């Protein structure tokens, strides 16, 4: 699902989801723990929960 999410970012934002968000905050990318840092990180957290 992570690769699909990256493809969605590529199509919507016009930038590489992996390179821009692969290591962003606590939840964007592989794994995740702690409290989301901001709205973007919260979006990744919500995606991880589905």
From Swiss-Prot:
Reactions that this protein is recorded to catalyse: a 1,2-diacyl-sn-glycero-3-phosphocholine + H2O = a 1-acyl-sn-glycero-3-phosphocholine + a fatty acid + H(+)
Pfam family, one: Phospholip_A2_1
Active-site positions on this chain: 47
Keyword Cell inner membrane: no
Cofactor: how bound: Binds 1 Ca(2+) ion.
Tissue expression profile of the protein: Expressed by the venom gland.
Cofactors (names): Ca(2+)
Key word Hydrolase present: yes
Superkingdom field: Eukaryota
Subunit-level organization: Monomer.
Sequence similarity: Belongs to the phospholipase A2 family. Group II subfamily. D49 sub-subfamily.
Protein name: Acidic phospholipase A2 1
């Amino acid at each position: 699902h992570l690769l699909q999410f990256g493809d969605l970012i590529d199509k919507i934002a016009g930038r590489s989801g992996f390179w821009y968000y692969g290591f962003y905050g606590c939840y964007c990318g592989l794994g995740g723990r702690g409290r989301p840092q901001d709205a973007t990180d919260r979006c990744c957290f919500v995606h991880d929960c589905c």
